[in-house]
Amino acid sequence: MQKIRKGDKVVVLTGKDKGRTGEVIQVMPKEDRAVVRGVNVVKRHQRQTQNQEAGIISKEAPIHLSNIAIADPKDGKPTRVGFKIDGEKKVRVAKRSGEVIDG
């Protein structure tokens, strides 16, 4: 079970976007990276195609998983993730507050 999943609210811990929060759009476990909405935005030069014109577009680049942390559901501050068996299910738990992380 992954600690960070698509749809999670995360906080950036280091880098140019330190302190910003966003939603995980995509997780790449083999590269240990994730794409977060509104974070690590870069400019890309787009070549003209049949259905898209040329120009410079902004898009989110992947960020390393070590540089982001799950936002605590209680107060939104960064927290580590633990696991707990809840009945028959294994659930993710915020170490900071003990709250179950939805997912």
Curated annotation (Swiss-Prot):
| Xref: HAMAP family | Ribosomal_uL24_B
The cysteines joined by S-S bonds are none
Could you name the domain of life of the organism this protein comes from? Answer: Bacteria
Q: Which InterPro entries match?
A: KOW, Rib_uL2_dom2, Ribosomal_uL24, Ribosomal_uL24_CS, Ribosomal_uL24_KOW, Translation_prot_SH3-like_sf
Going by the UniProt record, its keywords in alphabetical order are:
Ribonucleoprotein, Ribosomal protein, RNA-binding, rRNA-binding
Q: What is this protein called?
A: Large ribosomal subunit protein uL24
The job of this chain, per UniProt, is described as: One of two assembly initiator proteins, it binds directly to the 5'-end of the 23S rRNA, where it nucleates assembly of the 50S subunit.
Gene Ontology cellular component annotations, sorted alphabetically: ribonucleoprotein complex; ribosome
What the record says about family reads: Belongs to the universal ribosomal protein uL24 family.
Could you tell me the gene encoding this protein?
A: rplX
